Amino acid sequence: MVHGTGIDLVDIDRLEKILMKWDMSFLKKVFSPAEIEYCAKRAFPAIHYAARFAAKESFLKSLGMGIGMGIPLKDIEVRNDPLGRPVLNLYGKALEILEKRGITTVHVSLSHSRSQAGAVVILEGLKD
């Protein structure tokens, strides 16, 4: 049973300007060390940071929440499985809320164009 869906778009240029202005202080506040390492190794890191930021926002929206509503962004980590597909690893408050709501599966999809990155999150579980 679907428990929630979330979608978000991030303007890549806008995020790149934030990265240039705040540098590591922004990155360390929003992304895990593994996410920072992954994105930093890419030819265009801002695209990958933007997609991951969109996934974090999409996850929050799928819960009916937003930034600043109790789940730190670092509790939502975007990684890739062995086939390269994106997956969300959840920690702390994010995991606690999923367990409380009976959510057992989190689906995430990422995409980007030259100017925008987007993500969709779908939450599934057994309970109503």
Curated annotation (Swiss-Prot):
* Entry function: Transfers the 4'-phosphopantetheine moiety from coenzyme A to a Ser of acyl-carrier-protein.
* Protein's name according to its UniProt entry: Holo-[acyl-carrier-protein] synthase
Q: Which cofactor does it need?
A: Mg(2+)
Q: Which InterPro entries match?
A: 4-PPantetheinyl_Trfase_dom (IPR008278), 4-PPantetheinyl_Trfase_dom_sf (IPR037143), ACPS (IPR002582), Ppantetheine-prot_Trfase_dom (IPR004568)
So what family is this one in? Belongs to the P-Pant transferase superfamily. AcpS family.
UniProt record, GO biological process: fatty acid biosynthetic process
Instruction: Report the subcellular localization.
Output: Cytoplasm
